[in-house]
């Protein structure tokens, strides 16, 4: 049984979150949580929270056994970018893009 959890509009770029997602793809959930706990990146905390949510969804909604679960799919899509202005010298301004991403984790017992 596949169970999904999503974090939409996560405040990190998709490029940075994908680095972390690649670490846990295909792993058992216990091993994935351990890897994410000791990964020193902001995106690791975001991905870990989504993974924990997916595990809780599988246990509560589908009655799955946690020991059998593995990360079947994990992917990070780009979300909308927030446009901000940074003032520069001589009355100029630069545009800053604050990027967001959508993190999706699918856990499965197969």
UniProtKB/Swiss-Prot annotation:
This protein binds specifically to 23S rRNA; its binding is stimulated by other ribosomal proteins, e.g. L4, L17, and L20. It is important during the early stages of 50S assembly. It makes multiple contacts with different domains of the 23S rRNA in the assembled 50S subunit and ribosome. It comes from Histophilus somni (strain 129Pt) (Haemophilus somnus). This is Large ribosomal subunit protein uL22. Signal peptide: none annotated. Keywords: Ribonucleoprotein, Ribosomal protein, RNA-binding, rRNA-binding. GO terms for biological process: translation. It comes from the Bacteria. It holds the Pfam family Ribosomal_L22. Part of the 50S ribosomal subunit. The keyword Ribosomal protein applies. The keyword rRNA-binding applies. Belongs to the universal ribosomal protein uL22 family. GO terms for cellular component: cytosolic large ribosomal subunit. GO terms for molecular function: rRNA binding; structural constituent of ribosome.
């Amino acid at each position: 049984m596949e169970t999904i959890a999503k974090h939409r509009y996560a405040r990190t770029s998709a490029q940075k979150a994908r680095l972390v997602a690649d670490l846990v793809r295909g792993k058992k959930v216990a091993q994935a949580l351990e890897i994410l706990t000791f990964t020193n990146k902001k995106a690791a905390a975001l991905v870990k929270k989504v993974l924990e949510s997916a595990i809780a969804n599988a246990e509560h909604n589908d009655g799955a056994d946690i020991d059998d679960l593995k990360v079947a799919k994990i992917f990070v899509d780009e979300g909308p970018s927030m446009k901000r202005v940074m003032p520069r010298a001589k009355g100029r301004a630069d545009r800053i893009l604050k990027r967001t991403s959508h993190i999706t984790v699918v856990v499965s017992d197969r």
